[in-house]
From Swiss-Prot:
This is Octanoyltransferase. Its EC number is 2.3.1.181. The active site is at residue 174. The record marks 140 as: Lowers pKa of active site Cys. Residues 30-209 form the BPL/LPL catalytic domain. GO terms for molecular function: lipoyl(octanoyl) transferase activity. It comes from Rickettsia canadensis (strain McKiel). One of its GO terms (biological process) is protein modification process. Coiled coil: none annotated. Disulfide bonds: none annotated.
Amino acid sequence: MVQFVTIPNLTDYQVTLKLMQNYVNKVINVNEPEIVYLVEHSEVYTAGTNYKQEELLNYSDIPVIYTGRGGKFTFHGPGQRVIYPILNLASPNRSKDLKLYIKMLEEWIINSLNYFGIKAYLIKDKVGIWVKVRKDEFAKIAAIGIRVRKWVTYHGVAINISTDLSKFGGIIPCGLENSLVTSLNQLGVHIEMSEFDKIIQTEFNKIFT
């Protein structure tokens, strides 16, 4: 069974990035076991490899980090659960199939949200997990951006629990103009982060083990 490790308190993004990179090296070089890090970051905008500078609108005093993950700009901050699975897709019980891996990530998050009564969707040509907020109008509740090195995954998923959604106003999230963002709180679901963590671990084990 894959170990889940919760990093306490707000964590600097670059510190976590180094932690991930170091652990990926251990998985590749000395066959360390797979792990999933659960993190809550200090405020930061991160840019993936497909970012466009004009998608950074107004970030005031929030730092901007240019990362190696896929995707474009997103926001991380308090009240958001960020999940970093470090999995070895080359291991016998996995598959060297990135599309399948992303599909499994999506299914995992959708099932976890469903536990709390939130019906979530995938939208063609729009990365991430979405919920319907009005008739024919959707808002993103979770962002996905991954990277793989020698078939070992890192980076991952960010889910808005009680996030200050106004912070997304400093960017064009994931490069999608006029897209809405939402959170569990905004949808009327008020839970502790620890309660959410229990469910995502349960749902992870149903799909990845």
